[in-house]
Amino acid sequence: MQYHEAVRFLLDLRRFQVKPGTESVRSLLAEFDDPHEDVTFVQVAGSNGKGSTARMTEAVLREAGLTVGLYTSPHFETVRERARVDGRKIPESAVREFVERAKPWLVERAAEGDPLTFFEVVTAMAIWYFAEAETDVAVLEVGMGGKLDATSVVDPVAAAVTNVSLEHTAVLGDTVAEIAEKKAAVAPANQPLVTGATGDALATIRDHAGSVVTVGTDDADVTVRAGERVTHQESAVSVVADDWRVEGRIPLVGDYQAVNAGIACVLARQVADELGVALDATTLERGLRTAHWPGRFEVMETDPFVVLDGAHNPSACESLATVLDDFDFGALHLVFGAMHDKDHRAMVDALPDPDSVVACRPDNPRSEDPETLARVFENAGADDVTVGDDVASAVATASERADEGDCVLALGSLFLVAEARQTWTRTVTPVDVRDRTDATDLLERAHVADRDAAEAREECVHRVVRLSLQRRDARTVTEAMLTAGGDCATAGDAGNGELADVVLSGTLAAFDRLTTRLAADSDGLAAVAADVRACVGLDCDAGGDADVGT
């Protein structure tokens, strides 16, 4: 089984549970000799901020010298991002091994009418890998809720509920209290549950979790303060308890991130107590400062000010608006795309009034129609609202509208952020292909199917570049390269959420035709065209070759 085939199998699994609960994950883990019994776990639940909190907790524990696993969702470029050990993604070989072993059992369960979901299986894969990697502790971000979430198959030594707001009401309940009750179920047996919740949510958590440590800006067991912003993406923070305190910096901004940092400090101290590890203030401060977390008020450019944020519900949008208020900029240009099950009007109402909006559709089957999103903004009083399609084009449109000193903000979903980030993080790699052996090695590394590799290997005699693209962009580039007279080989269709490796080969003339077509089409691939032209040397003043494969 090739890696892309393993990923395709995972992504083809259903997305919604037939039978809520942890029994299915527990049964799958039993096929792997119950690896969850061999690892110390931390669970982080919450409506917002649980990913950031999990990352900060992991960073502090690593700074303490522990081998630490981290499980988060969703991923930006590859499913391997979801499971990491000491910052390194789960290897492709481990993904293949897990799927090869699990597939017969999973197929049999599906045939019996009791299939597992993608999230359940990937959660089991992460837990198995953490045991295989002999981690000292693993931090798990809860997917949804708490009590019935797949991650609750473990018995955590420490756990948190970052906060509670109305979300996933069809599954979790119609009130904050109902949702809080389900999230409180992650409470560990021997440590207080840590929470940044307030009001009715906190009262409910106290009723159902027993002992609780509260973290907040006022009237809490652990008090936090967000200090001055040091840079666009770093701020000072203080965390003060009765017998310890931390004065440091975090690579995240906003009062809510200060609360998350406080929760992470308490969790890390609880784990250290359980494992008998020393954890002083200096270690906490150093760990927090290394906890970079993409897609959370991530500044991509400073003039115009371009920000990507995964705010995906009204509460997160309200927090984002508060952070924005601390920045000086001219006009505000929004790029907005969200899933269909969100409260779009409440999200829009929580945001500052925009000067322009481009509504778009992330490449996900749950994405809301951009026409619907545009109408929501119009009904809320926005004047300049444009209906776009793909995220890349929407970002390009908003950026073209922005003058110096303006702000471009892309938000609404982490799926949107994942696609938007490609504008800045995409790499086009020149490859030195001297002979058939080099071509074979390249195509194998790119996970190109055997038949396509055999055809492409014979043609890899000109310039060769490798890049990773979203699924629909990969299809567009493939068709354009073939039309241009070049050759293109892609990894098997891994599906939504997984970038496809694309290997292009051809003469300079073929690359010229390809990039000219991509730049002219309205598919948001003009930036890709520019990167490819630069990579193969088409923009060299002397017209000569760049240092690429020949």
Which role does the model predict for each range below?
Residues T40, V137, D149-S152, A158, ...:
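Nucleotide phosphate-binding/pyrophosphate-handling subdomain across enzymes
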